[in-house]
């Protein structure tokens, strides 16, 4: 039976679109589907209320009809809510606090209670985090590197460690009462990650390890991407996905996140440091090491030497600044061909060689650092090991690249296809929900993340905006005031005629292009004495811009921008697609009356990484297609083109989504490039944007577009007075 609006216990009266979203979410989870949801407003409240109502119904069914099968284990169904950052997880926790669920105590049992309507039921919620977020031991938390923190923590737990060197906050039989106290306090009210850390500090128990005992008692668990998307992280937290519901918010960058989490980069300098540490360790303990251990350490030294020598050759030659690397070239050193990669991988995992070598190196460094008053450096070999493991077992989905940078050279293992890494989650979970404000274009999720999921289990949902249609105008500006066509391709980006300042927040394809624009604006105009385009704009709006260099923090830049806008003077904020201001920051009301997207921010097709990605997509499409070779080639090329365009348009849609944050907000969206008028490009925009572009055309003169914008804002001012 479809839930009614009041059954979701939304903190406010939900709009019709929000109610549709919550009902569809409820239905998908109940039926065990894999679904992608796009909802530009009210998404967070919809996710919290929709999942809570479902939990309560599951619990009611479970208590009324205990299940006989054990398909999903002994635990009740949980909601595992995942997002990219802890700030987004904190926002979700805030939404949970606002939902008031009625008591599930039957009325028969509540007779005689004075105010049954006042009975409410809380949700058992747990925020999970990494050691970096939750460690309360100052000897460990003071380290500024995630790997160093993890290694120091594990070192303190090793057998034989002196009592004074062990962590006093680690849960044990002696402090079991504190662990139970921690559990009860965590489950009493909804707490975010900072609350969890403070609670552990107040009680005197490690919140990272104590949280494990809370997981099985929780109904909703929130956690960041790395803790959900890595099997090793889930195992470390004793977190099972089997039979539970996985909800991933802000999922527009999920595929990139999976690839990045399972990709590793090392540098030549790190390899050289690890080689020195390995040889020093081998010489120091050569008489104590067993023959088998000496042999494996010698193999690691030969392998690291071979990789180091090949990178030095690339660095010292006049090869391109970046390019692909063949595994056979890295393993061409003397004696490397005799190494059994599977046995060496097992040895690296089981022997904990990296921890031993890094531990000895750190002990040696600490004595020198104390004398020189230096901070301990990062454990290097542990990082090298994380690269060697995938190198020893390369899959078809991964590829190696080198990148020269500032006298050093990086070696990068890049996961090209996230499907298999995510499949275990999809197969184990009861239901998987991907949600975001702007998830368009959605074809990538279907083709590259869920191609194996039956269509009967798969669903996509895109909801409109809560604003009335007259509160948005979206225009393609394909020509300048002089009639020059806007075509911000790589080949035409140096043309000075392409730049027309307009709007409040402008997003440029890259930092380099933004620098070019600022340089052109600051040139003296022909026939003008010491007057520049920059001066003319400054006469109307104060110009602020994002910078690659950290000369000013994002918070300071936004505060200055908001202060100028709040003072009544206009401001033009120049930003970069994919930069600090393009995600997670909302420009509502006067802060975002206009959003300009300058050009299409396609990734650099000439980069080795993107050439490899597109080649992989094309090869996969070719293998999966049928018909003649010519037809399969066409299918492959179309798949590569679509994948490339989708990456660009996901970034564009994220920028567009920064504006219009509530029902009474209004804004103009201007897409400055004639290519936005192509049906293939417009088809990848969110539906609520496309609806506003029905009468737009890149062939219209700039004056006509500017006239439309002027009428739009006049109408808005009139309606608000």
Curated annotation (Swiss-Prot):
Q: Which InterPro entries match?
A: ATP-dep_Helicase_C, DinG/Rad3-like, Helic_SF1/SF2_ATP-bd_DinG/Rad3, Helicase-like_DEXD_c2, P-loop_NTPase, RAD3-like_helicase_DEAD, Rad3/Chl1-like
An example Gene Ontology biological process: interstrand cross-link repair
Q: Where is the Helicase ATP-binding domain?
A: 4-301
Q: Which reaction does it catalyse?
A: Couples ATP hydrolysis with the unwinding of duplex DNA at the replication fork by translocating in the 5'-3' direction. This creates two antiparallel DNA single strands (ssDNA). The leading ssDNA polymer is the template for DNA polymerase III holoenzyme which synthesizes a continuous strand; ATP + H2O = ADP + phosphate + H(+)
- Cofactor: how bound: Binds 1 [4Fe-4S] cluster.
Q: Name one GO cellular component term.
A: chromatin
- Record's Pfam families? DEAD_2 (PF06733), Helicase_C_2 (PF13307)
Gene3D superfamilies reported for this sequence? P-loop containing nucleotide triphosphate hydrolases
Organism's domain of life? Eukaryota
Q: Which residues cross the membrane?
A: none
Location of this chain's protein in the cell: Nucleus
Q: Where does [4Fe-4S] cluster bind?
A: 135, 153, 167, 206
Identify the PROSITE patterns for this entry.
Answer: DEAH_ATP_HELICASE, HELICASE_ATP_BIND_2
- The sequence motif named DEAH box is recorded at 249-252
Family to which the UniProt record says this protein belongs: Belongs to the DEAD box helicase family. DEAH subfamily. DDX11/CHL1 sub-subfamily.
Q: Which NCBIfam families does the entry link to? A: rad3
Protein name (Swiss-Prot/TrEMBL): ATP-dependent DNA helicase chl1
The lineage, from the top, is: Eukaryota, Fungi, Dikarya, Ascomycota, Pezizomycotina
Give me the gene this protein comes from. Answer: chl1
């Amino acid at each position: 039976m479809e839930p009614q609006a009041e059954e979701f216990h939304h903190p406010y009266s939900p709009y019709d679109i929000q109610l549709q979203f919550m009902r569809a979410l409820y239905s998908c989870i109940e039926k065990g589907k894999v679904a992608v949801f796009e909802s530009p407003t009210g998404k967070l409240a919809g996710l919290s209320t929709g999942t809570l109502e479902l939990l309560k119904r599951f619990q009611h069914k479970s208590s009324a009809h205990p299940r006989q099968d054990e398909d999903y284990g002994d635990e009740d169904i949980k909601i595992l809510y995942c997002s990219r950052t802890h700030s987004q997880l904190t926002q979700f926790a805030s939404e949970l606090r606002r939902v008031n669920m009625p008591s599930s105590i039957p009325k028969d049992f509540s007779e005689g209670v004075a105010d049954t309507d006042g009975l409410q039921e809380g949700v058992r919620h747990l925020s999970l985090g990494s050691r970096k977020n939750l460690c309360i031991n100052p000897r460990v938390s003071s380290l500024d590197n995630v790997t160093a923190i993890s290694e120091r923590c594990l070192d303190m737990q090793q057998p034989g460690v002196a009592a004074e060197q062990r962590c006093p906050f680690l849960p044990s039989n002696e402090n079991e009462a504190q662990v139970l106290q921690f559990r009860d306090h965590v489950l009493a009210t909804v707490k975010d990650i900072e609350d969890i850390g403070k609670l552990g500090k107040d009680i005197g128990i490690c919140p990272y390890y104590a949280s494990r005992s809370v997981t099985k008692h929780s109904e909703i668990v929130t956690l960041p991407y790395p803790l959900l998307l890595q099997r090793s992280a889930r195992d470390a937290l004793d977190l099972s996905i089997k039979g539970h519901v996985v909800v991933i918010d802000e999922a527009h960058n999920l595929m990139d996140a999976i690839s990045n989490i399972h990709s590793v980069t090392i540098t030549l300098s790190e390899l050289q440091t690890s080689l020195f540490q390995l040889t020093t360790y081998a010489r120091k303990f050569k008489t104590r090491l067993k023959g088998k251990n000496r042999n494996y350490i010698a193999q690691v030294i030969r392998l690291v030497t071979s990789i180091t020598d090949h990178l030095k050759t690339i660095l010292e030659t006049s090869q391109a600044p970046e390019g692909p690397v063949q595994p056979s070239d890295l393993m061409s050193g003397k004696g490397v061909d005799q190494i059994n990669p599977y046995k060496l991988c097992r040895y690296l995992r089981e022997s904990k060689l990296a921890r031993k070598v890094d531990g000895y190196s750190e002990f040696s460094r600490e004595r020198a650092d104390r004398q020189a008053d230096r901070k301990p450096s990062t454990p290097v070999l542990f990082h090298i090991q994380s690269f060697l493991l995938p190198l020893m077992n390369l899959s078809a989905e991964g590829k190696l690249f080198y990148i020269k940078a500032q006298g050093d050279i990086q070696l990068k293992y890049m996961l090209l296809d996230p499907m298999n890494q995510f499949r275990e989650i999809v197969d184990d979970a009861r239901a998987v929900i991907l949600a975001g404000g702007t998830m368009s274009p959605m074809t990538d999720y279907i083709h590259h993340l869920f191609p194996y999921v039956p269509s009967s289990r798969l669903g996509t949902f895109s909801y409109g905006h809560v604003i009335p249609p007259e509160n948005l105008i979206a225009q393609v500006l394909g020509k300048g005031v002089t009639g020059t066509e806007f075509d911000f391709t790589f080949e035409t980006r140096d043309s000075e005629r392409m730049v027309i300042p307009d709007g409040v927040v402008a997003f440029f394809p890259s930092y380099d292009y933004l620098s070019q624009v600022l340089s052109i604006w600051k040139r003296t105009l022909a026939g003008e004495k010491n007057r520049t385009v920059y001066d003319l704009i400054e006469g109307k709006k104060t110009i602020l811009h994002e910078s690659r260099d950290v000369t000013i923090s994002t918070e300071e830049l936004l505060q200055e921008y908001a202060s100028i806008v709040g003072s009544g003077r206009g401001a033009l904020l120049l930003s970069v697609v994919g930069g600090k201001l393009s995600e997670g920051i909302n420009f509502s009301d006067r802060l975002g009356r206009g959003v300009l997207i300058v050009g299409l921010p396609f990734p650099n097709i000439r980069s080795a990484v993107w050439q490899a990605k597109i080649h992989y997509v094309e090869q996969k499409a070719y293998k999966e297609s049928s018909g003649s070779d010519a037809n399969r080639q066409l299918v492959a090329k179309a798949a590569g083109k679509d994948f490339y365009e989708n990456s660009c348009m996901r970034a564009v849609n994220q920028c567009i989504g920064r504006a219009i944050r509530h029902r009474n907000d209004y804004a103009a969206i201007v897409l400055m490039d004639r290519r936005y008028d192509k049906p293939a490009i417009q088809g990848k925009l969110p539906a609520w944007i496309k609806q506003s572009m029905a009468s737009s055309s890149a062939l219209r003169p700039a004056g006509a577009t500017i006239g439309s914008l002027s009428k739009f804002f006049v109408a808005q001012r009139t309606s608000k007075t």
